[in-house]
Amino acid sequence: MPVNPKDRYDAMTDYLGRVGQFGPCMMRCSASTQVSIDYVDERDSIEKLRLGTVIGPILAYFFRNTPYFEGEKNPWPLLRQRMWDYLDFQRTNVLPGLFDPRYGWEDYAIDVLSTPLMFADLTHTPEAVASGATPKELHRPAFRENAGEVYPDRELNPYEINHIISTHFNDVRLKNFIELRHWDSLPIERAERLTEIVSSLFYVPEHRDRLESYFEGISEEEVFEAKANIQAHGREATPYGQPLHFWKEFLGLEGLLSDIPGDPKHPDVFQE
């Protein structure tokens, strides 16, 4: 299956095709539904990053849409998570250190700046453009170099910052908004319902307060355990020590529209 004919995707195919179990598959068969939410300041953003990371896998289970994979019945309850979690740990999965009480924007910046870029985009870097670099030199693989080695030692401009962040694919990603990335590609009606649920959980104060109180003090290790628990046990899973029917009620997961086919070309196929 071909990908968009861009230098970036050529580099990603080359790099990610050599790491993890599902590098080539990630770019070709892990389409997603992503929901973005706003934040007002650093503290608000960190709290939402944590909450989104904690509940994302549970929502992913109730909105999963991958009954088949490569012509066979899909063996993983959360296939998209399985692909990404084992892809390239330095740029996927849970943000490292997120659940440390001291975690802040500086820690996020250190993480994205110190990881090999995978692909360098210097098309909006004045120093590189002025040097007479060719188009291929401005758009090139960077499998070993991190941002500090590629970009000039100055305050980065918005384009450069956005590019660096875009080379990370964590479960929840921080930009000038928060990007929740856990979920399978969904038919539009189910994507709208998922967005309604996310909005309710994050924007209705009593709902958010209840979640933050329940998960107060949770650790990174507990999140990893919950994700693995769902993968190992499916409908019998007990993420964070509670069965899935508890989470369905606690998170207000009503009207999930699971009777809508996941693919209109196959109206008789549903997620079990």
Can you annotate each of these PLM segments?
Residues 37, 46, 55-58, 110, ...:
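Weak global preference for isoleucine
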Residues 6, 155, 159, 163, ...:
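Low-complexity, intrinsically disordered regions enriched in charged/polar residues
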Residues 1-173:
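Loop-rich catalytic cores of soluble enzymes, especially ATP-dependent carboxylate-amine ligases
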Residues 171-173, 178-254, 258:
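Substrate-recognition/cap regions that form aromatic- and gly/pro-loop-enriched pockets
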Residues 251-272:
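Eukaryote-biased recognition of C-terminal alpha-helical segments
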